[in-house]
């Protein structure tokens, strides 16, 4: 029956305790379901009628502070390290960060439509990631003349991809822009 806010840590990664998974809603925890060997299966939260979130300050010019913010806010758990698609190890500097702003899958949502009205936040997020490592932003040719671009941040490269699926796949974009292995 604990009360949680949006962004309140629910649990941590037992291998890397800095990596947290946070509450997506504010409300009251109603159930914690565990499986074999106490494996966490689900956490149920009864949402409040009004959502209240924890506030986080965006760091100005420090890559390490950006990583700390990602860890504290629970967003670090959504990052993926290639080639094994695992959560990256905090404290290990990445070579590059890839962000794909489109999906070429059939019936996929149009990211430009989804991000409408949040272009400033999107650009601030890309600029913050660029303080950690060079960012490669993958877009399709239809997005070149949208409010998502241009992004005027150092260390941000915009790469335009076109073609059928899997052109929007991050792995394909990595292979075309900066391959993990050139062998």
Which role does the model predict for each range below?
Residues 12-15, 34:
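Generic short alpha-helical segment signal, independent of protein family or function
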Residues 9-12, 104:
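Residues immediately C-terminal
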């Amino acid at each position: 029956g604990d009360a949680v806010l949006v962004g309140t840590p629910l649990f941590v990664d037992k291998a890397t305790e800095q990596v947290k998974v946070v509450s997506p809603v504010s409300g009251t925890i109603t159930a914690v379901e565990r499986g074999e060997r106490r494996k966490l299966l689900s956490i149920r939260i009864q949402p409040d009628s009004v959502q209240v979130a924890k506030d986080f300050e965006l760091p100005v010019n420090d890559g390490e502070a950006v990583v700390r913010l990602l860890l504290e806010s629970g967003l670090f758990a959504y990052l993926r390290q290639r080639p094994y698609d695992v959560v990256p190890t905090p404290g290990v500097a990445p070579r590059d960060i890839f962000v794909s702003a489109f999906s070429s899958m059939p019936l996929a949502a149009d990211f430009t439509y989804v991000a409408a009205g949040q272009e400033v936040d999107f650009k601030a997020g890309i600029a913050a990631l660029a303080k950690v490592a060079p960012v490669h932003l993958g877009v399709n040719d239809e997005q070149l003349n949208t409010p998502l671009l241009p992004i005027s941040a150092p260390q941000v490269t915009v790469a335009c991809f076109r073609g059928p699926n899997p052109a929007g796949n991050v792995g394909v974009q990595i292979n075309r822009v900066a391959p993990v292995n050139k062998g």
